[in-house]
Amino acid sequence: MSLPLTRKDLMIVNMGPQHPSMHGVLRLIVTLDGEDVIDCEPILGYLHRGMEKIAENRTIIQYLPYVTRWDYLATMFTEAITVNAPEFLENIQIPQRASYIRVIMLELSRIASHLLWLGPFMADLGAQTPFFYIFRERELIYDLFEAATGMRMMHNYFRIGGVAADLPYGWIEKCLDFCDYFLRGVVEYQQLITQNPIFLERVERVGFISGEEAVNWGLSGPMLRASGIRWDLRKVDLYESYNQFGWKVQWQKEGDSLARYLVRIGEMRESIKIIQQAVEKIPGGPYENLEVRRFKKEKNSEWNDFEYRFLGKKPSPNFELSKQELYVRIEAPKGELGIYLVGDDGLFPWRWKIRPPGFINLQILPQLVKKMKLADIMTILGSIDIIMGEVDR
């Protein structure tokens, strides 16, 4: 790192990788002139676990439990992209009911991720109360996840061709009750935070990104939409069944930390709208179709009594990934989560490239913090919303 030659008595400060305000194991080498930030160099890789190489030595079903460790606060999205890639590669159609279930789970996971962004973000700014409030709602989402998937965090719920299990009896009513309750919770957050003068002093005109800069840096998600770019893959790519619901893309034009906060608050409201519509319109029918496809290929294939005993434990069948390549993407809470998949007529992917939104969004941090105050670093870093599990992979 080159230091400016014109300044004297510069101080170099290490923030992290074990720092009380750091969002994971991230290290920042910050060069200071008093309180002013002259330079900032992020050091990554402390949580690198070779996720892409592991994928090349596993079948998709064997790899599914690994992917929930990328963004461990929004695990439904990492599962979704992992099963979407082979589904698109082999043109596997999923039942309508399974698609609706996926949308419900994805939007619940989006709310849970935004909540656990909001709490630490406010704690970074010195407000401890919202940090405790967000866990009140987040635990209710975990209760819904646990009832449907058996796990509160690492769900392992999505499958190629559908989902692992149907929604249990009474789950839909509980989900609707949560939606009604959570809308009141969002109003409470806005009354507590949005017009607070201390909060506004910390976030207004801090970390400004223009629309042109956001596009040139490859930013996505709330980082992009807060700079005036109305780009949401749920509207652009129309994956799953998002085109069957009425909702609006949340965006702001100011491009600062306050705009990114407002976008995420608005997204939680829109997620509730999508969930309510999906729950009310959810059709009947199967929740997966790979078993049906497998039995159609075999002559005189039928279930026997012994197999029925293990119906819940039957894994999805493996299949060869044809020799072709494609890029699949979804709108995760932090931005565009993508997979570049190359098949090689084998059970394992030949190449499995992950495009994590947090890694791309983090690259603009040194530019944002230059000429700012030391205290603004945590404001800007918090507004980016990163999880080091997906940044380092």
From Swiss-Prot:
The keyword Nucleotide-binding does not apply. NDH shuttles electrons from NAD(P)H:plastoquinone, via FMN and iron-sulfur (Fe-S) centers, to quinones in the photosynthetic chain and possibly in a chloroplast respiratory chain. The immediate electron acceptor for the enzyme in this species is believed to be plastoquinone. Couples the redox reaction to proton translocation, and thus conserves the redox energy in a proton gradient. The gene is ndhH. It is a peripheral membrane protein. It is found in: Plastid, Chloroplast thylakoid membrane. GO terms for biological process: photosynthesis, light reaction. InterPro entries: NADH_Q_OxRdtase_suD, NADH_UbQ_OxRdtase_49kDa_CS, NDH1_su_D/H, NiFe-Hase_large. Coiled coil: none annotated. It comes from Brachypodium distachyon. This is NAD(P)H-quinone oxidoreductase subunit H, chloroplastic. Keywords: Chloroplast, Membrane, NAD, NADP, Plastid, Plastoquinone, Quinone, Thylakoid, Translocase, Transport. GO terms for cellular component: chloroplast thylakoid membrane. It catalyses: a plastoquinone + NADH + (n+1) H(+)(in) = a plastoquinol + NAD(+) + n H(+)(out); a plastoquinone + NADPH + (n+1) H(+)(in) = a plastoquinol + NADP(+) + n H(+)(out). It comes from the Eukaryota. Belongs to the complex I 49 kDa subunit family. NDH is composed of at least 16 different subunits, 5 of which are encoded in the nucleus. Pfam families: Complex1_49kDa. Its EC number is 7.1.1.-. GO terms for molecular function: NAD binding; oxidoreductase activity, acting on NAD(P)H, quinone or similar compound as acceptor; quinone binding.
